[in-house]
Amino acid sequence: MKPSREVIRAETSAIPIRLLGVPDVVAVPHSVVLTARAVNQPSRVKDFISLTKPEVLFLVVVATGVGCVMASKSLDLLTLMHALIGTALVAGGTAALNHYIERASDSLMRRTAGRPLPSGRLKPNEVLMFGIGLSLKGIVYLAFTLNLLTGLIGLTALLSYLLLYTPLKRRSRLCTLVGAFPGAAPVLMGWAAVRGDLGPEAWVLFAILFLWQFPHFLAIGWMYREDYTRAGMLMIPDAKEGPDVNEDSGRMTFSLIRRTAQALVVVSFLPVLMGMTSGVYLCSALLLGLSLLYVVNGATSDRSGVAAKHLLHATVIYLPLLFLFLVLCRTDVVAGWPL
């Protein structure tokens, strides 16, 4: 006995197709259609996580931890935990709000067009509330579990990033300079979480992270200069030169990369001069610095997208290793060493 048409309509979803130019109908169960859609559509949870920019968030957490450790004579793990959680909440919320503000620009760039907002997977109001919620929770968390100064630094970093750096991307080539201030705030937050103030040593850590951002983000700006130009963003000094590399193209960008990298290497020696670390760190910082400058010089000579990518990778390797040696070679840790 054949099932009636009513039964077929109730249990299946008819999807029209064409085979050899002849219209036809294929009956596909609703469960199959829904399953296929679920498989093809990225998870909403994954999309919300991506709004926090996990790769950047990792470096933020590392920098905060370094600030905590360098400020501590005997590290309180509870304080460290509060600092990491609070800073991660603020940074993640700031990143989500940045996604919301730049959703129109992101839709114009190839590398960002697939993000949750430009692709339509998430609604703007969802992202806005998510970003506000994370940010406020982070600031309040830092202020109540640690101290008011740490919360204020987090609030200042959030506001300067969203209200100064983000709009300046479309108006001024100084945006990278302005953005480097909130970008270096995590080490101050880590230090303030432990000490409740900001001594000279905290500003040395700040200077290291501040200068590191120039070769790092200018390399990204050069790699994706065509995308940024399409979106009207002035991320590099040579922003109006376009995507083609010629004899003069990138001269200002790579000159700034070279100078800030040189300054970074010099500033990286200051922890030794201030008695924060031992001579072992000095040797490590020198070796890392020379390696970074070698890559910078190669990129400056080449000025290609591939060279900029190598530089980007070098900066990503340089900073965590420098911080690692900084923490391992603290003077209180190696007080008994001959160095």
Go through each PLM region and give its residues.
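Small-residue-rich segments of transmembrane alpha-helices in multi-pass membrane proteins
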Residues: 62-65, 116, 178-194, 312-325
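Transit-peptide-like, low-complexity N-terminal presequences
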Residues: 1-46, 335-339
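Cytosolic, membrane-interface loops and tails of multi-pass inner-membrane proteins
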Residues: 31-41, 101-122, 218-251
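Interfacial loop-to-transmembrane junctions
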Residues: 293-321
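Juxtamembrane boundary at the C-terminal end of a transmembrane helix
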Residues: 324-339
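Intramembrane alpha-helical segments
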Residues: 124, 128-194
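Multi-pass membrane catalytic core of lipid/isoprenoid biosynthesis enzymes
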Residues: 111-152, 243-272
